[in-house]
């Protein structure tokens, strides 16, 4: 519109995969490298006011040696404009709009306790005119109900052609603390820039007053209280949508994460939508945000890795839910270059944000490897029973780490196994060859049942993150007879089916009542004598087989794990029912199995695949 002439005009892209060129009326307005961070292009000099304007965005998601991730082996890097685009209009003097596409407002906290907290609000103010401009900046803190808590105003003359920083310092007495899922209380900070009494710019940011502390060997503390770090990981893509999600899909994913009882989320392996970080602020999820420095190095990604970390920090700085910045994930070779780049990114994190932790992740299984010596926290990905050794080997590994590295802040940052819900068997070993085309859901369940029980016994593991909350795309692979899919999720790629492992964690983690019979998809039984497993966090269940109550229940790995052994099935149809009266309400679950003689479903699957090439 013509009334915008004389103002500054920006296009703010929340995500374009992964190299973007923005053209306005044939002129190149800006470029950006990286699929996951936002970027802002000023187009003030290219637009025609009061006329039609042509905007062209060229997007290329080909792998490049100078853009992380430098290959697309671990996950799909989707192309195009897949997140919202905003037209931002400001006065010639404004809170900065193009400081790495950040809000331009940075909130820090010091000396946080129940009695008081010190809060500093720094605002970057930009002047593009050729003359000094007298301005007033007001920073105000409001409580959840909109009541003013504190306010500070300052008058100044903004120098021409440049950016200046202005800060307000507050001391809050008896602050209402942000206490995770228990009480995710948020204030809001409103920064107003005024000229001659008129508001010319305003930015609103969340304020959750909290203190994170990690103590080696003891755990994670939130505001001085030990806090359980019950973690899941999340890739953002959906079947049929890729990464082009609306807030509806983000909200659905978060609802499942809340339902399972998680308290912390590792958003892997890249910066995710700012909307989802904001929702974690309001839900009380403690989160880990990271950049896509993964898998391999090219030697040409140094600048871009720093750029993407700087963008992540500045764009996400004010989210109280974020406790750590992730530097890299399983970047193995060459060691010297990787260690140097990790150290440099860590230093950048501390320069940009000295109050949060950093973490680097490897899959080596020992804590003295040089690529992981340059961050505050050691993250380790271990897939016992899947990529290495046996399911049960997690226990001696943790005990060895406790003994040899008691001073380390150590997290188990990935663990689990794939599960194709179409693949089922009762016949399981303690390890599975991940190159096999047969990925039984029951093996994933067995893995998580045992491994979570061991993790829960060891507070040395500061946090654990199961891999993954949802199945996701891996374009270059074929796993478990499915193209381009990693199936380690607790839910399927389309989010329609919750696997048995989902209910294992919900029973162990959630305060919501759970009564669940496992192996409902393993309906064609291979053995006449079998076991029945029930997850119940509301007491000992009563289980019936074809109307007859079973006896001889025993506890499994945790207090929610109930097993009935040596159950003899009838030939043909078998109806299993679990029931339990809890606080005056009856809970039930029912499934159906069929037994038609001894068989081996894995052997049948492999034979059929050999003969027909598919199942």
PLM features: residue spans?
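Substrate-binding/catalytic cleft of secreted carbohydrate-active enzymes
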Residues: 254-257, 264-497, 501-508, 512-531, ...
